[in-house]
Amino acid sequence: MKTQRDSPSLGRWSLVLLLLGLVMPLAIVAQVLSYQEAVLRAIDGINQRSSDANLYRLLDLDPRPTMDGDPDTPKPVSFTVKETVCPRTTQQSPEDCDFKKDGLVKRCVGTVILNQARDSFDISCDKDNRRFALPGNFFRKAREKIGKEFKRIVQRIKDFLQHLVPRTEA
């Protein structure tokens, strides 16, 4: 008489259940996005909703705030995006696009959820009014200031020397 223990199908089912038990936790872990991945997904959403002609790409991501471990809790985010040369209608990833020279820069704040299954974000972006100092402008302004200061010093030396020259009375 054959017992269930001798059945080859029971061994296979046991193996399948064991493998499923090992794979399921990996699938759950894979559904949690990193902070940066969640922000990049939010930028994809911003690009889809945008009425602007070109795509935006992440320019600067503020440091990740300390957060709890629950991926379903909204996490605060703040970052800056800049306009790229790629049209919004392209199928290209924004990360593959170059920034547009003098492209529009936007400051974005809001919340994201790290649970990939929920894929939720609430972000608002406004034109960034902060001035980004370009190296060329910095050096030009520094050169102008040094030039003005140099002229002022030369004039003071000339004035000093003129006062040293003995005056002759006519």
UniProtKB/Swiss-Prot annotation:
One GO term (biological process): antimicrobial humoral immune response mediated by antimicrobial peptide
Subcellular compartments: Secreted; Vesicle
Residues annotated as signal peptide: 1-30
Any one GO cellular component localisation term in the record: extracellular space
Entry-linked InterPro entries: Cathelicidin-like, Cathelicidin_CS, Cathlecidin_C, Cystatin_sf
Cysteine pairings via disulfide bonds: C86-C97, C108-C125
First-listed, main subcellular location of the protein, grouped into a coarse class: secreted
Residue numbers covered by the propeptide annotation in the UniProt entry: 31-131
Pfam families in the record: CAP18_C, Cathelicidins
Protein's UniProt name: Cathelicidin antimicrobial peptide
UniProt lineage: Eukaryota, Metazoa, Chordata, Craniata, Vertebrata
